[in-house]
């Protein structure tokens, strides 16, 4: 990928290691900037957002990132109060929002929605979650957190735990990790194993093993990336109830983990990480959420400014 200026950010598969490291460098630069320096990154620009699915952290972090970078944001966070409720097409909504903004952020329940939006928009489109496919800015945030908290990514042993079938953050994370020298353990209940097509896609890039047992690997892991089992993706609630609560990270599990190991979660969480873990030095999921503002600000700065900032 040659440069970010004016580019759509649809999939981490479009980002090689060099591109990811560029985002990380600019994120570190943004973190070190004074408030007045930050406001020059996107000053005078407007970010449009379209969220067809509920979102707290992703939407608010994009808004916070744009505000911190000196820009403004506007958009649709509740489709029930917009013309979408009247039957307006995705294409028309995207075209309309593109007229009001310099870049667009889209979350949509349908696979392929972000690529479609990029085809009809004359402004850069950033994928904030498309169906069960990908969530690229979450993966960037996740890798930055690992890099910052562990001092690097290469050589780490990373466990990805929970819903590997429906979790779009998982697919983006695994593809991004394929650019680094890491070992990955994919830990899930049998019904929530990573999809066969995705296994095929990452097999040549990633050293990984699959298991249903977290206990089997937890003492070897440098990073435990926990995901929520997503009730809303299940066609049958009974099937959800069979796997709900399959893994719970509590203090007993922490005692089995390596010194210096960290726990991440894309959030929101349900009961997969006990609240008693929050105050420990291994709990990095709230810091991870904070880093999302910085990584998104850096990404917006790269997309909106020729030659970076």
Swiss-Prot record:
GO terms for molecular function: amino acid binding; aspartate carbamoyltransferase activity. It catalyses: carbamoyl phosphate + L-aspartate = N-carbamoyl-L-aspartate + phosphate + H(+). Keywords: Pyrimidine biosynthesis, Transferase. Carbamoyl phosphate binds at residues 57-58, 107, 135, 138, 267-268. SUPFAM superfamilies: Aspartate/ornithine carbamoyltransferase. Heterooligomer of catalytic and regulatory chains. This is Aspartate carbamoyltransferase catalytic subunit. It comes from Cenarchaeum symbiosum (strain A).
């Amino acid at each position: 990928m040659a440069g970010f200026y004016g580019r759509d950010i649809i999939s981490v598969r479009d980002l090689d290691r060099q591109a990811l490291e560029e985002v990380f460098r600019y994120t570190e630069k943004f973190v070190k900037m004074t408030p007045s320096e930050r406001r020059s990154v996107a000053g005078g620009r407007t970010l449009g957002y379209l969220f067809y699915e509920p979102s707290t952290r992703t939407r608010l972090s994009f808004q916070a990132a744009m505000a911190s970078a000196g820009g403004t944001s506007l958009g649709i966070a509740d489709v029930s109060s917009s013309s979408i409720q009247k039957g307006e097409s995705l294409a028309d909504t995207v075209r309309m929002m593109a007229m009001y903004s310099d870049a667009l952020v889209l979350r949509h329940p349908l696979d392929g929605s972000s690529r479609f939006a990029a085809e009809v928009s004359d402004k850069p489109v950033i994928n904030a979650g498309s169906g069960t496919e990908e969530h690229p800015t979450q993966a960037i945030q996740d890798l930055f957190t690992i890099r910052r908290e562990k001092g690097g990514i290469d050589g780490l042993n990373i466990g990805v735990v929970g819903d590997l079938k429906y979790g779009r953050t998982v697919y983006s994370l695994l593809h991004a990790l394929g650019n680094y020298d890491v070992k990955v353990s994919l830990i899930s209940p049998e019904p929530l194993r990573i999809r066969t097509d995705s296994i095929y896609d990452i097999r040549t890039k990633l050293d990984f093993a699959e298991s249903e047992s977290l206990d089997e690997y937890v003492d070897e892991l440098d990073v435990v990336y926990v995901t929520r089992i997503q009730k809303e993706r299940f066609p049958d609630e009974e099937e959800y109830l069979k796997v709900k609560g399959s893994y719970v990270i509590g203090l007993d599990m922490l005692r089995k983990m390596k010194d210096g190991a960290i726990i991440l979660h894309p959030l929101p969480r349900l009961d997969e990480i006990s609240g008693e873990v929050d105050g420990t030095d291994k709990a990095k999921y709230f810091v991870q959420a904070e880093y999302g503002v910085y990584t998104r600000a850096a990404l917006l700065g790269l997309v909106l400014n020729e030659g970076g900032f």
